[in-house]
């Protein structure tokens, strides 16, 4: 295919504005889905002995196994029903499950109703993660029709920013909710925290109102469900613009009927997609292995409390690291490596190898550890945005984008589940196992990323 055919298209200002209005609210919905997913980690610290590390690892592990395998159904389903319906299902379902988890804590803490927290949370979080699994496939499915292959590296960076913003919501906003709803406030509250405290009537509370960690994202997601129902469009033609050839793996097949067997065969026999899926399994281990367990390690082993910078602003650090990693990865992919994704993933995995090895030697040196986990977050979120957010569109094409991201994001959460159960078990025995567990996955991911260094999507046939 000639360079002229693959040249970046020139869009009108009106199209770019409408595309922004399409992906930005959907991106915020996706970010708040993260808040409704990882608030479990913040609740674990807030609940103390009510949720042990083993319980947390099991609940999170059950949810992530569900998330991983739900993609096998929800990816092809989203290719059939479209991304808009998928994101609406995701937002409404996740909001409802968070509402149920909040009600469970309310009954348990405020009214002393005897409930088995492990069983109830495992079931609710399982269903939460099932609905959550529609989110990533929806955002990639919709944007596959709005972004040309030469624009997708930058979109992969944007995807990384959205993930990072979601982590900021999940950790910092959830921590802010914890501070605002404590019976005995031990730190100065900012304007928003004080406002929330008065709004929900926590000023004169006699117990910590931890259930608001789940109520707040539920309310936000219900609002975005209504917003997206009116704003989001699956294709440019639904918003008054002409559809265009994005020159991905579905190029020239726009009018062909969706055939599940054909699309599954295409995805499962694509060497690059399978390798990307395995790389992303390693990404899942490394991303959650740092993101969740550092937060717990810092409190348990380093004695950092809610007022300490890294605990109070862990989400902000993840957002800055992830956003910069995502945008740099997108820039390098499109501008330096000719819209190839493998070289960027290999570069970032090389950084992760170095950091995880050093981490094993400076585990209890707070400042050095903070720098290392931030750099790993920079690298892992950049990799995830580039592979799950961009390579899936490239090699799956518009017709199979959701199925491709389903397989690949499913692999991410298979890795997440592996680390959740494994590190929950290992860290109960010795925290030194934490970085040692991560090192092999960083090496394996690097080797696989190098193997797809030259991979680039090919259109099925010339488009008209």
Each language-model region and where it sits:
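C-terminal transmembrane helical hairpin of 12-TM major facilitator-type secondary transporters
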Residues: 339-387
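Cytoplasmic membrane-interface "Motif A"-like loop-to-helix N-cap segments
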Residues: 80-92, 334-349
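Extracytoplasmic gate region of multi-pass secondary transporters
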Residues: 38-42, 171, 266, 270-330, ...
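Cytoplasmic helix-loop-helix junction between adjacent transmembrane helices
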Residues: 124-163
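Glycine-rich segments within core transmembrane alpha-helices of 12-TM secondary carriers
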Residues: 153-179, 322, 409-419
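Central cavity-lining transmembrane alpha-helices of secondary-active solute carriers
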Residues: 58-76, 316-329
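C-terminal ends and interior cores of transmembrane alpha-helices
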Residues: 92-114, 350-364
């Amino acid at each position: 295919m000639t360079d002229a055919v693959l040249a970046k298209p020139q869009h009108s200002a009106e199209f770019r504005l409408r595309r922004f209005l399409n992906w930005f609210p959907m991106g915020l919905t996706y970010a708040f889905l993260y808040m409704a997913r990882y608030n479990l980690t913040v609740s674990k610290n807030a609940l103390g002995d009510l949720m042990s590390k083993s319980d947390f690892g099991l609940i999170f592990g059950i949810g992530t196994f569900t998330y991983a395998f739900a993609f096998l159904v929800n990816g092809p389903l989203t290719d059939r029903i479209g991304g808009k319906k998928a994101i609406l299902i995701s937002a409404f379902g996740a909001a409802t499950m968070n509402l149920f988890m909040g009600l469970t804590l309310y009954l348990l803490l405020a009214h002393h109703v005897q409930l088995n927290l492990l069983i109830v949370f495992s079931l609710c979080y399982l269903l939460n993660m099932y609905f959550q699994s529609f989110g990533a496939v929806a955002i990639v499915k919709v944007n596959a029709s709005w972004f040309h292959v030469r624009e997708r590296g930058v979109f992969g960076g944007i995807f990384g920013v959205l993930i990072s913003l979601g982590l900021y919501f999940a950790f910092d906003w959830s921590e802010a909710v914890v501070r605002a709803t404590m019976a005995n406030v031990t730190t100065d509250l900012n304007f928003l925290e004080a406002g929330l405290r008065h709004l929900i009537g926590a000023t004169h509370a006699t117990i910590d109102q931890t259930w608001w960690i789940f109520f707040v994202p539920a309310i936000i997601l219900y609002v975005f469900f209504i917003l997206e129902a009116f704003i989001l469009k699956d294709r440019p033609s639904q918003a008054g613009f002409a559809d265009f050839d994005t020159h991905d793996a579905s190029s020239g097949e726009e009018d062909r009927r969706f055939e599940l067997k054909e699309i599954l065969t295409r995805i499962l026999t694509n060497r690059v997609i399978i390798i990307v899926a395995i790389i992303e399994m390693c990404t899942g281990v490394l991303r959650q292995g740092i993101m969740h367990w550092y937060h717990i390690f810092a409190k348990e082993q380093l004695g950092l409390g809610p007022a300490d910078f890294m605990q109070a602003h862990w989400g902000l650090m993840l957002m800055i690291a992830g956003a910069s990693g995502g945008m740099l990865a997108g820039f390098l992919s499109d501008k330096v490596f000719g819209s190839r994704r493998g070289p960027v993933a290999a570069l970032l995995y090389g950084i992760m190898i170095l950091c995880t090895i050093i981490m094993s030697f400076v585990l209890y040196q707070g400042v050095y550890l903070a720098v290392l986990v931030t750099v790993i977050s920079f690298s892992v979120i950049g990799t995830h945005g580039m592979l799950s957010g961009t390579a899936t569109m490239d090699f799956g094409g518009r017709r199979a984008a959701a199925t491709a991201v389903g397989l690949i994001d499913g692999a991410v959460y298979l890795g997440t589940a592996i680390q959740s159960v494994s590190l929950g078990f290992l860290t109960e025995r010795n925290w030194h196992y934490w970085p040692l567990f991560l090192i092999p996955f960083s090496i394996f991911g690097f080797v696989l990323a190098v193997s797809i260094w030259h991979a680039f999507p090919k259109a099925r046939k010339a488009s008209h």
